[in-house]
Each structure stands twice: as structure tokens, then as C-alpha cells.
Amino acid sequence: MSAVTWFNQLPPCRFATALRRLTSIFAITFVVFGVGLLDSQAEAQPLSCSQLLAVKIPAYAIGLPTTGAVVTATQSVAASGTGTSAVGAYCLVSGSIMPIDPTAPNIDFQLALPAAWNHKVMMFGGGGFDGSIPSVTGNTPSAALNAPSPLGRGYAVFASDSGHQDPTGTGAFTVNHEALLNFMGEALKKTRDSSLFLVRAFYAVDRPRKSYFAGGSTGGRESLTVIQRWPEDWDGAIAFYPAWDFAALTLGQLHIAEAFAAPDAWPDSAKRGVLFNAALAACDALDGASDGVISNVRECLRIFNPATALLNGTPIRCPGGADTGDTCLSDAQLAALKSVEDPVPFYYQLPSGETKYLGNNVYIADNGIPNPSPYEPIVTELALGSAPPAFPVTSSMLFDAQISDGWIRYTVVDNVNFDSLTFNVSNPGPYTHRVQYLSSLDAIDYNLSRFADKGGKLLLMHGTADMTVTTRGTEYYYSRMQETMGDERVHNFSRFYLIPGFQHAFSTVFNPAWDNLTELEQWVEQGVAPRNLVVEDTVGVFGRTRPLCEYPAWPKYNGSGDINSAASFTCAGSDDRGER
């Protein structure tokens, strides 16, 4: 009998004893349940890529309830690329984690195991409703163009579909409770434990030296989730534009859809261009530089009012308030924009402590304007769409409507025929307790002491013009962390950066790129905290740079020097910690 077959046939009661026997055979030490791993790095016989296909992962090796996991495919992939794009040879493993509920879908996952391993692992988060496996050969969000991918650096990289297979993102999977729990976070632990089981088998080591998580949007929420719930598993996390408290966020997204679904309230692309250009005319120079980027956001939001704003000396409000064409905004459109800009009260409290949706910086965003940028189509979809919201929702409508529609119909109301645009966000009536319950499942813990105390480090980043996941939500989360843990303690293990002009994952104004993984590695592994960082624009004005300012600071032009160089800017508006 082969070692793999013998291992797979072990009953649970003999697992610990069998692992001690495996130590004598392979010099590998495991710990039951896959959550604690020992420090021994003894010589051992690793399994080959093809041998992994025969490995079965027992349920008791996974830290949350499953019926175990299997490897469904393995593939030896040759080295490719050159320079910073080089990726060495690796073993690509596909697997499935089986549910307790036989009607629930599997969690499908992939794992890339490089031949030249750096003894570190990276998990990638997903996006939207998940439903497909992120590429394990990809890079961290907003990575520098010349930054090697984690796999290229030698990381073992893994990711999953979070427990359902639906890349179209309807949200229908949430009618199954186990699938819902997986999406809200449980799949992350199950994927991590299953992947590390295979890492140990392939490399014949007890544990990786360091473990990192990286994601944006839903992946950013997932990054916060793992360090809140299982901090012992992780050393560093990248959480960019995180869609944390998904239940509250989708209510805000629905409010946006409802505002623009009102009669004649939705502004087309040309009208959005009028609004954006008026905001630039009023606010661009507030940071000292007329560079097409509104950096002094707080001052802009204080002084800019579309109802009275001018563009080239002409009011952008249509004469008399009626819609007279694409050169102005009607009163109905101005009212919808103001409704989206302003907070929305909840006449109930969520488990996160939230009593309102905080609104969006809609006045200063490229909401999908006439623009030759190759990113404009996706920016349009993620902002206000190319058609007004209506029921039933279509893919041409704003992404907020698409996400919130599926969440309301399937997850909250459990009625596929329910018109989501009739849902009362402020007062859900009979659905209030359901909304509160769903919020309780999410990443809403502001006390990250366990993660901080073990030396974990967190990088947060958000764009000031995000219309999909409101910037104000991340500001709120960070402020609650400070209230809970204390400002200095938070600063000892985390950094939060705001990027002026950046939208959601993509931007036509300022699309940031920086070597965030290297910064995180240096902080975690060498104790060198990020300082004086520079971020590069890869779309708006290709190659221009700005200082990456720590919240609440923003880049202010010094008054002289190259307007496209970070050296000509200083981070202004910092709090009492001083400018960083």
C-alpha cells in the first residue's frame, strides 16, 4: 500500500497516531484540524504534483464543518516570462471542498505550488458575489506594473470561488444557508486549511514561514474577515476598497439605484461630464495644482453645490429646472445626486453599530463621462451605468443596482419576483431582523488586537471617488478601529491610504499602482514600516506620480516643480501624528 493510500484511509480516531507514524516515514509533523503547525523543518519526502491527485483531505483537518475535500486535477506548468514577469515552474492543483448540506454547492479552489518555494503563502480574495476562482497567477490589487506577482516571487498561492459557481453574480446561491455562510466568510477558513494541507504534503514541511492575504472590494472584505476571525492564521493583509458589512453596503447601493430610478432622475453620460467638469472648475486648484485631480476632497465637498455651480460662467442647473438637454442638469437629476451624496438614515441599528448609510462622493467622481480612456466602459458600469435603473435589472444598469437587486430578492426577501426598487432602505419593515442578522455574519469587528498582538500588519487603501463601495465606509471602519484600540496602537500595525480621483478598482482620473506587497513584506518580516511612499498613475496621465498620503492627509502641490512628480507635492491635512 502506498503512503498516500494509507494516509487517505485513516479513520478519525487514528489520525494523531497516524501522523506520528508519518513523521517517522516522511519526517513530517502535522497538527490535527489544520490550524496549528509546528516549527520543525526536518528532511522529508515530498509528494510529487501527480501524487497530490490521490490525496484526500479529511474533514477533521479543516477548521470548520465540511465533509472533507478532494483534489480534482493537477498540472505541471513550465516556467514562463522574463524579468519581473517571470514565473518559475509550478504545480497547479484544483480541488473541491464538500459541504455538510448535500444540497449546498462545493467550494472549488485552486492552488499554485512553485518548484522554487519561498516558504510563504498568499491567498487571494474575490469580487462581487464571487462565484469564480481568482487567478492564482495574478498580482495583488493596484500592484506596480513592474512588481512580480506573488507566484513569481515564489509564493504558494491559493484562492476559491467562496462556495458557489456563478460568475454572472445573481446572488441566487444565498438561498442555501451553508452557501451563504461560506460567502460571508466560512469558505475562507475552509480554503486556507485545505490548501495548507496540500502545501505540507507537497513540500514536506510543517508550516509556511509567513502567510498573507490580498484582495479588493469583496476581496477586501474577505481580507478583513480573516484577520478578524482567524488572526492566528495570518501575518499580513492587503484590504483595498473593502466591501465590509456587505449587508449595510448593499442597502446603500440599493438607495443609489432607487434615487436614479425616479422619473427623469438619471443623468446620461454627457450630463455627468457637465457635473464632473464643474466640480473640477470649482475644486481642482484647491490642492494647489490644476491637474485634473481633486485632492482636497473635504474642502471641495464643503464649497461645491451643483444647484448653484457654474461651468464657463453658466449655471449647470437647467433654466427653470426642467430638462432642456445635455448641457445642464434638471432639478430631478440634481435631487437624485444630492440624495446619493447625503447620508441615508436607518431607523434601526445594525450589529456593526451603523445607523445610516454614509453616502457617496458622487459630485467629484467620473461617473461615466465622455472619455477616450480604455477604462471608461468599466468605470461607467461601476458608477451610474449606461441605462437608468429599472426592474428587472439588466447588465447595462449601474453595478450597484445589479448587486443590490440580487441581494434583496434572494437573500433578504427570498422572493425571486420581488421588485427590489420598492424595498424601503430606511425602514425595511418585516425584513428588518433579516437585515440585522445578515449584517451580524460579516466583517464588523473593530478590535483587531489579536492580529496586532501577534505582529500582524494591515494595509488599507481606498479611492476618494468610489461609487461602488463608498469611501466613507472605510473611513468609518478605520475611525472605529481607532476608537476601539486607540490611535497609536492602530498606527503601530496598520496604514490607511486615500487615493484622490481613484474610483472602484479602475479609474480614468488617477489609476494607482505601487509595490504594496513589498511594503507589507518589509513591515512584517523586517519591521520596516511604510514611509514616504509614492504611487504612480497608469491611466489618467500615464507615469505621473504622487505621494501616497496616509489618511486623512492628501497631496498638496508645493507651488513649484514638475506637476507630474511626487517630489513637487507634500502630504497636507494630517492629524496630530504629523505629516507622513
Regions found by a protein language model. Give the residues of each.
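N-terminal secretory signal peptides that target proteins for export/translocation
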Residues: 1-20
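Bacterial N-terminal signal peptides
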Residues: 22-37
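Catalytic-loop region of hydrolases
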Residues: 42-120, 133-138, 143-145, 276, ...
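Cap/lid segment of the alpha/beta-hydrolase catalytic domain
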Residues: 118, 127-205, 251-252, 417-431, ...
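Alpha/beta-hydrolase fold nucleophile elbow
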Residues: 206-216
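Glycine-rich nucleophile elbow surrounding the catalytic serine of serine-hydrolase chemistry
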Residues: 215-225
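A catalytic-pocket lid/entrance helix-loop region that shapes and gates access to the active site
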Residues: 225-227, 232-345
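Short beta-strand/loop motif that positions the catalytic acidic residue
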Residues: 460-462
